[in-house]
């Protein structure tokens, strides 16, 4: 059986990878290996590895890589630790293919070590554009280190080919998020309010604002202006999800928590998980922020 090693580092990529992992797990031709790292293993971000275990996936390796700093220097040190950790994990697991999604720095490190170890990489959701963030450079770099590409649209397929990848290995398979929407039984309004321990209003917004990693100085100003605008919506209830583990992420989190403490019509969660997040999307009037 071919060993497919899936790497997940955050609530975001796991929500999309889950159904691919299910199919690999249930295959009689493939064997699932799972490396969990990054924000999944941090209490600050909700220990979301527990959701993976609740979904009955066996975790082969837990790689703790996040240093207690959200400065650019701290992120660089986390990347260094990630490179060392992934080198050992991939050497021990000896997978036939490493399967990754997206553009975060921990995924960049996983793919870098796989490339050096001559392990083929399959990359999901390449060819996309994220203006104002280092994700853009990370994603295209991951593309160049990968051998198989599974993209969401023909536009993204063309972009991956423009980067020099062979068309025979670039597949337009659609968005994985659609699979999740079709397979999940979303919560009704009453059930959602119960699991959130928060009452929805007549008007509701779901808010996520990540650090703008290519413009740190304006990022905090942008969030400050966003919170000021939201504070003017007296008749609107606000549900915040917290930022990623990026440079200045903790500063952004502190600003949001301070805002929520002073507003009875708002709440904040380190992680909602896929079911609660998509259920929120179903029932709110709008989604606000800069999350992709």
What positions do the PLM features span?
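Structural motif
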Residues: 3, 96-97, 204, 286
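Active-site and donor-binding regions of nucleotide-sugar-utilizing enzymes
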Residues: 5-8, 14-25, 65-167
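A nucleotide-sugar donor-handling region in carbohydrate enzymes
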Residues: 7, 41-43, 146-221
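A generic structural motif
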Residues: 26-33, 58, 234-238
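Conserved nucleotide-sugar phosphate-binding/catalytic loop shared by glycosyltransferases and other
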Residues: 31-75
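Short internal beta-strands
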Residues: 33-38, 149, 238-243
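Donor-nucleotide binding loops and adjacent catalytic segments primarily
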Residues: 52, 187-283
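A donor-sugar binding/catalytic signature common to diverse glycosyltransferases
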Residues: 100-101, 123, 149, 273-292
């Amino acid at each position: 059986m071919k060993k497919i090693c899936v790497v997940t580092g955050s609530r975001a990529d796991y929500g999309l990878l889950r159904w691919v992992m299910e199919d690999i797990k249930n295959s009689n031709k493939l064997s699932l290996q799972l490396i969990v790292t990054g924000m999944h293993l941090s209490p600050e971000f909700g220990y979301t590895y527990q959701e993976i275990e609740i979904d009955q996936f066996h975790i082969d390796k837990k790689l703790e890589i996040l240093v207690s700093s959200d400065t650019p220097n701290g992120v660089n040190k986390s990347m260094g630790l990630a490179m060392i950790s992934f080198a050992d994990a991939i050497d021990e697991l000896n997978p036939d293919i490493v399967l990754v999604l997206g553009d975060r720095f921990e995924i960049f490190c996983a793919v870098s070590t796989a490339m050096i170890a001559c392990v083929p990489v399959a990359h999901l959701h390449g060819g996309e554009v994220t203006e104002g963030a280092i994700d853009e450079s990370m994603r295209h770099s991951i593309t160049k280190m990968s051998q198989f590409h599974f993209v969401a649209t023909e536009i993204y397929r063309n972009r991956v080919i423009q980067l020099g990848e062979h068309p025979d290995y670039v597949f337009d398979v659609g968005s994985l998020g659609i699979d999740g929407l079709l397979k999940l039984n979303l919560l009704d309004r009453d059930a959602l309010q119960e699991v959130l321990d928060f009452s929805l209003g007549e008007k509701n917004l779901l808010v996520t604002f990540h650090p703008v990693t290519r413009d740190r100085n304006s990022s905090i100003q942008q969030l400050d202006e966003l919170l000021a605008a939201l504070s003017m919506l007296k008749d609107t209830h606000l549900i915040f999800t917290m930022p990623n583990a990026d440079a200045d992420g903790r500063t952004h989190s502190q600003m949001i928590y301070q805002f929520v403490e002073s507003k009875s019509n708002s709440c904040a969660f380190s992680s909602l998980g896929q079911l609660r997040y998509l259920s929120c999307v179903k029932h709110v009037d709008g989604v606000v922020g800069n999350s992709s």
